[in-house]
């Protein structure tokens, strides 16, 4: 729970409650060294809710040290409540059989039953209430072949039945690994993958801490993608490897939020179907040089979605072909650890990536309607945003460096470790969001950053 505000800042009450629980039972049967049967039954329950209230003119009582905000249901100007419940019951069984040193076989089945409840209340009015019980029944077969020592084949498929879609879903896959020399592996693979749920997180949300999920609309094709991957891995020495991989993904079916759903039929109009394409290249270097170890990575990616957002049957290239929210063309990561001696060790983490995409504000408009009306003297006190291309702009590059020091100790007879860390060592201003003030003329925009330089410490011990 958080409550902030006072003086010229709106009063805000923010309550955030979440939790999950998992129960699992499994049984393994091994009749001989070549034969293994595994059976599992699990139940997972996940609940997340947010209660948000804002008062643009809070009653403040000032003191020398703080402002006390009087904010309650009667005085709040804006309220929002969200509740998301997910229950997942999963029963599955797999059978693995090693026929010989050159052939192994694996098969199995799965029954997954879900219960999904999602509800939104805005300004004390329920705007979204979706309840569903999707079920997926599937079976799979996978064969690994090693006809000669330098070549491996992996071939298989998964056959699924989704209770909200009439047709059976077939997902084939195949892969090959070739070792021309003992220290080099060349790899290629293809696979078709289906997903029966899609995320419904709002594009404008500030922090995507968790994903909210809903099943594919009734009688609609599940999300489907074909993955093509080619790569190589080279073992320089013990603990030192280099890998390079390139990929192309073609999505024949995806779902994105409908900007104008029909709230009388929210279940079937909450999302719009479309297509997408993604490609990229990834480089990874793992190092282990006595006292210095860690890894360095670089990735380039491009992800574009195509969705008929206005549902007119025509794709508008400028506004309906757009980057995904998580599209970051360039990403560099480094994680290094240096062992000074048996007691002390240093750590360094560096991240550089392209900024996250966002939908830009390109103008403002007077809000209409009784709720947005100001007063007789000043009727146009409320403004709304005019948005540009979805995810058409990008925040500045994200740069962050963290350092840490670990000290091993034996306190109270416990093997433990003291950990000290400085987050965002360079105090780089990484933009979290832009907030527009349309009451000014011309409108003004204020950038808000993520966390500044932060010092943390902790004590980790083993019992």
Set out the residue ranges of the language-model regions.
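Structural signature of Gram-negative outer-membrane beta-barrels, strongest in the C-terminal barrel
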Residues: 41-42, 86, 98-106, 110, ...
């Amino acid at each position: 729970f958080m409550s902030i505000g006072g003086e010229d800042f709106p009063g805000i009450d923010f309550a955030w409650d979440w939790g999950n629980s998992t129960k699992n039972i499994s049984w393994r049967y091994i009749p001989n060294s070549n034969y293994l049967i595994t059976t599992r039954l699990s139940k997972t329950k996940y609940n997340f809710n947010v209660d948000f209230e804002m008062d643009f003119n809070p009653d403040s009582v000032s003191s020398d040290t703080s402002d006390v905000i009087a904010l309650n249901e009667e005085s709040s100007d804006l309220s929002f409540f969200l509740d998301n419940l997910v229950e997942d019951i999963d029963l599955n069984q797999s059978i693995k059989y090693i026929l010989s040193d050159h052939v192994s076989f694996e098969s199995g089945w799965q029954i997954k039953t879900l219960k999904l409840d999602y509800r939104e209340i805005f300004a004390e009015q329920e705007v979204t209430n979706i309840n569903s019980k999707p079920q997926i029944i599937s079976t799979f077969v996978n064969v690994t072949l090693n006809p000669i020592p330098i070549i491996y084949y992996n071939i298989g498929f998964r056959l699924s039945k989704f209770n909200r879609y009439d047709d059976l879903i077939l997902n084939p896959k195949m892969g090959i690994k070739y070792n021309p020399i003992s220290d080099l592996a060349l790899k290629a693979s293809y696979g078709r993958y289906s997903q029966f749920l899609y995320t419904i997180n709002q594009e404008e949300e500030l922090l995507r801490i968790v994903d909210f999920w809903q099943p594919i609309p009734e009688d609609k094709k599940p999300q489907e993608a074909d993955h093509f991957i080619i790569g190589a891995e080279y073992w320089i020495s013990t603990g030192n490897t280099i890998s390079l991989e390139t990929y192309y993904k073609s999505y024949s079916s995806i779902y994105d939020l409908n900007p104008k759903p029909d709230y009388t039929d929210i279940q079937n109009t909450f999302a719009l179907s479309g297509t997408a394409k993604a490609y990229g290249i990834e480089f990874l270097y793992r190092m282990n040089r006595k006292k210095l170890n860690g890894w360095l990575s670089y990735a380039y990616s491009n992800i574009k979605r195509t969705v008929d957002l206005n549902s007119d049957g025509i794709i508008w290239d400028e506004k309906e072909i757009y980057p995904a929210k998580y599209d970051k063309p360039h990403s560099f990561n480094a994680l290094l650890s240096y062992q000074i001696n048996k007691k002390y060790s240093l750590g360094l983490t560096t991240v550089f990536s392209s900024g996250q995409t966002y939908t830009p504000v390109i103008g403002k408009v007077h809000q209409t309607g009784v709720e947005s009306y100001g007063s007789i003297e000043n009727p146009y006190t409320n403004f709304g945003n005019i948005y540009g291309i979805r995810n058409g702009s990008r925040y500045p590059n994200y740069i962050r460096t963290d350092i840490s020091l670990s000290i091993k100790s034996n306190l109270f007879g416990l093997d433990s470790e003291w950990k000290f860390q400085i987050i965002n060592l360079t105090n780089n201003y990484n933009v979290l969001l832009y907030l527009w003030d349309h009451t000014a003329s011309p409108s003004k925009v204020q950038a808000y950053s993520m966390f500044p330089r932060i010092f943390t410490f902790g004590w980790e011990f083993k019992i």
